Regions:
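Glycine-rich, N-terminal phosphate-binding loop of Rossmann-like dinucleotide-binding domains
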Residues: 75
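FAD-binding beta-loop-beta segment adjacent to the flavin cofactor pocket
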Residues: 285, 320-347
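Catalytic phosphate/metal-binding cores of nucleic-acid and nucleotide-processing enzymes, i.e., regions
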Residues: 350-351
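Class I S-adenosyl-L-methionine
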Residues: 60-70, 78-293, 299, 321-322
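Well-ordered alpha-helical segments embedded in enzymatic catalytic cores
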Residues: 14, 41, 99-102, 365
Length: 376
């Protein structure tokens, strides 16, 4: 029997990617997305569903939407995330995160058997927990049994430190177990490209600025905010706006001495001295120093691309630093290279690609949720 699916706040639809990976018989009867670049990406990957975008969720007439069995709603985290202004998600508040309540109409009218919610971990914090409880109560009144869990993608075969809260809801009396976390040997370095264009590498001016700012922070007792990580690690969270902050996703790679300028050589010496002095540890103020990770996991992929730096000194001396490429960020969201190529060939800018990756859901986490939900 074909599973009928509707994805709200779809993005490029990692939910469908997970269902594709399961090889489950499904049909996307509708999706809801207003961001023009996300729509372009979705159309590039799923052209067969191009005419099924119902647009703004607050304006959908659900009477005109075909019935569906699975409804997914990864509503905006803008007003919940610690990276945002935390305006909240009060019903009727007009905030982007408040769009959650627009999903009530779909659930009340269509009564799909399965629901899947995803959002940032902050939704479970004291400030926002009452809203989550209110939503949970609404679903219970509608006859759903609900199961909530915080999952980290690093525990599901993807080397990114990304915690998200998921709620699975099943109509009627039911039981659901989230898949147990498991260890993986996959490291950030396994997802990196071998040949990267020079434009991804930080300029000498930028590197010098980072050094000065690091030294200022260290004098204040805060440690370094500039925290590169080697490829034998887990990536930090992928954000939507890359390289806005020092503690972003950057990679340090080998550089032959004869390619270095005198200034860059001095930079290398300063960084090497920092390593030799053992100045690599996190501070209590969330200010971090240059610290090689040893766990093989990237930090979380976010919309601001600020946390992943890779380093690999040559002869313990020379290296250069670059940011993650858009393709590497998509890989850390567990998107296949085939689908990445479709996105990149659709004319979407690099900035928008970074944003898209940071806004999405890690495919393999969804895969294991669906695997348990549909018992495959």
């Amino acid at each position: 029997m074909t599973l009928k699916v509707f994805t709200a706040f779809s993005g490029y639809d990692s939910q469908c990617m997970a269902l594709d990976r399961m090889k489950i018989d499904y049909e996307l009867v509708g999706w809801s997305e207003i961001d023009k670049y996300a729509i372009m990406a979705h159309n590039a990957i799923y052209p067969q569903y191009k005419d099924r975008n119902f647009g703004d969720i607050s304006k959908i007439d659900w009477e005109n939407v075909p019935d569906f069995d699975l409804f997914t709603y990864s509503f905006p985290c803008t007003d919940i995330s610690s990276a945002g202004q935390q305006k909240g998600l009060e019903e009727g508040s007009g905030t982007r995160s408040g769009l959650l309540w627009e999903c009530k109409k779909a659930i009340e009218l269509k009564r799909p058997k399965y629901l899947l919610m995803e959002n940032v971990k902050a939704l479970t914090q004291k400030k926002f927990l009452p809203y989550l409880h209110k939503w949970h109560s609404f679903l219970t009144e509608m006859g759903y049994t609900n199961f909530t869990q915080i999952l980290n993608s690093k525990n599901f075969g993807v080397p990114q430190n990304r915690e998200r809260v998921f709620m699975v809801s099943i109509l009627g009396d039911a039981w659901f177990d989230f898949h147990k976390p498991f260890q993986s040997d996959k490291k950030l370095k396994d997802l990196l490209d071998e040949n990267v264009d020079d434009r991804y590498y930080l300029s000498q001016r930028c590197l010098s600025s980072f050094i000065r700012k690091n030294e200022i922070q260290r004098e204040k007792g805060n440690g370094f905010t500039f925290k590169p990580t080697n490829g034998d690690c887990i990536a930090k969270t992928i954000l939507t706006h890359p390289n806005d902050r020092l503690d972003d996703n950057y990679i340090i790679e080998p550089l032959e001495p004869n390619v270095l300028t005198p200034k860059r050589t001095e930079y290398g010496k300063k960084m090497r001295k920092a390593y030799e002095n053992g100045d690599f540890k996190e501070s209590r103020h969330n200010m971090t120093i240059l610290e090689p990770r040893t766990d093989g996991i990237s930090n979380i992929i976010t919309t601001v691309q600020k946390d992943n730096l890779l380093y690999e000194p040559i002869n313990n001396k020379y290296f250069r630093i670059r940011k993650l490429t858009e393709k590497e960020c998509f890989r850390l969201m567990d998107v296949s290279d085939e689908n990445i190529n479709k996105i990149q060939n659709s004319g979407i800018s690099k900035t928008q690609q970074y944003k898209m990756a940071g806004n999405s859901i890690v495919v393999n986490v969804l895969y294991f949720i669906f695997k348990n939900l549909f018992k495959q």
